[in-house]
Amino acid sequence: MKNEKLPQFQPHFLAPKYWLFWLGVAIWRSILCLPYPILRHIGHGFGWLFSHLKVGERRAAIARRNLELCFPDMPENEREVILQENLRSVGMAIIETGMAWFWSDSRIKKWSKVEGLHYLKENQKDGIVLVGVHFLTLELGARIIGLHHPGIGVYRPNDNPLLDWLQTQGRLRSNKDMLDRKDLRGMIKALRHEETIWYAPDHDYGRKNAVFVPFFAVPDTCTTTGSYYLLKSSQNSKVIPFAPLRNKDGSGYTVSISAPVDFTDLQDETAIAARMNQIVEKEIMKDITIYMWLHRRFKTRPDEKTPSLYD
């Protein structure tokens, strides 16, 4: 079941205006040939550089506010430690994205392991909503799982057509297909064909098709209702969370797959969205330092006239 809408390589991608982009990709791929322990140091260096750029300072302010909103009872100095580690992780994410897109299967397997794979194998005939969260390791996590259990990714097309093509090629290295995050019909069809779809419900996509439910200490977080439509349209599908984690000792990565979460007792979209947020919270707490705190998770408020939480 291939998606014919996937971006295709275009001859004009070789035009002079893209040459600088191609040079950057060539340098990126060359760096990725280095041993993994060296790549870790380079990634941390990128993170240090990011934190000292203006864009990094802006994102750091957003991340600091997100942590304050989610964990108001946590001492400020503890939140600051998490923030600094998170900023350092941003640089490593650049390296890990390249690993996911360009490394060979054998090299990926050498530096990774999967725990809980049996949950996918035992439920693959029912269709699986593989709930991911926006960890900085998400690209690599999808590649690792795909080597053991290929599935279908859900993504937002990139505004840059060349980057959109490149990221699609990278994401298909060990997976079956990609679907636009707005293609709910395609997701439902995939589940009914007993496929596994990677689905991340933890970004603020605006008030359309959304409800406001708790997320950590924020009681009214804008949360997509896509989960409701997926589960009600394919009622046999299993919801299975996973988290791609960095091993603290520098030995690579562990993808942690959890047991299926039951949603059969819930009937309305608000309750389903709230439980999905609880799943996301649990996964985030497996390593709070690698979550994408740099996004404005709480930008949409229930009342449009309410002041922004980021002002």
Curated annotation (Swiss-Prot):
<feature type="short sequence motif" description="HXXXXD motif">
    <location>
        <begin position="134"/>
        <end position="139"/>
    </location>
</feature>
<feature type="transmembrane region" description="Helical">
    <location>
        <begin position="19"/>
        <end position="39"/>
    </location>
</feature>
<dbReference type="InterPro" id="IPR004960">
    <property type="entry name" value="LipA_acyltrans"/>
</dbReference>
<protein>
    <recommendedName>
        <fullName>Lipid A biosynthesis acyltransferase</fullName>
        <ecNumber>2.3.1.241</ecNumber>
    </recommendedName>
</protein>
<dbReference type="GO" id="GO:0036104">
    <property type="term" value="P:Kdo2-lipid A biosynthetic process"/>
</dbReference>
<keyword id="KW-0472">Membrane</keyword>
<dbReference type="GO" id="GO:0016746">
    <property type="term" value="F:acyltransferase activity"/>
</dbReference>
<dbReference type="Pfam" id="PF03279">
    <property type="entry name" value="Lip_A_acyltrans"/>
</dbReference>
<dbReference type="GO" id="GO:0008913">
    <property type="term" value="F:Kdo2-lipid IVA acyltransferase activity"/>
</dbReference>
<comment type="function">
    <text>Catalyzes the transfer of an acyl chain from an acyl-[acyl-carrier-protein] (ACP) to a Kdo(2)-lipid IV(A) to form a Kdo(2)-(acyl)-lipid IV(A).</text>
</comment>
<keyword id="KW-0812">Transmembrane</keyword>
<keyword id="KW-0808">Transferase</keyword>
<comment type="pathway">
    <text>Bacterial outer membrane biogenesis; lipopolysaccharide biosynthesis.</text>
</comment>
<dbReference type="GO" id="GO:0009245">
    <property type="term" value="P:lipid A biosynthetic process"/>
</dbReference>
<comment type="similarity">
    <text>Belongs to the LpxL/LpxM/LpxP family.</text>
</comment>
<comment type="pathway">
    <text>Glycolipid biosynthesis; KDO(2)-lipid A biosynthesis; KDO(2)-lipid A from CMP-3-deoxy-D-manno-octulosonate and lipid IV(A): step 3/4.</text>
</comment>
<keyword id="KW-0012">Acyltransferase</keyword>
<dbReference type="GO" id="GO:0005886">
    <property type="term" value="C:plasma membrane"/>
</dbReference>
<keyword id="KW-0997">Cell inner membrane</keyword>
<keyword id="KW-0346">Stress response</keyword>
<dbReference type="InterPro" id="IPR011920">
    <property type="entry name" value="Lipid_A_LpxL_LpxP"/>
</dbReference>
<keyword id="KW-1133">Transmembrane helix</keyword>
<keyword id="KW-0448">Lipopolysaccharide biosynthesis</keyword>
<dbReference type="GO" id="GO:0009103">
    <property type="term" value="P:lipopolysaccharide biosynthetic process"/>
</dbReference>
<dbReference type="GO" id="GO:0016020">
    <property type="term" value="C:membrane"/>
</dbReference>
<keyword id="KW-1003">Cell membrane</keyword>
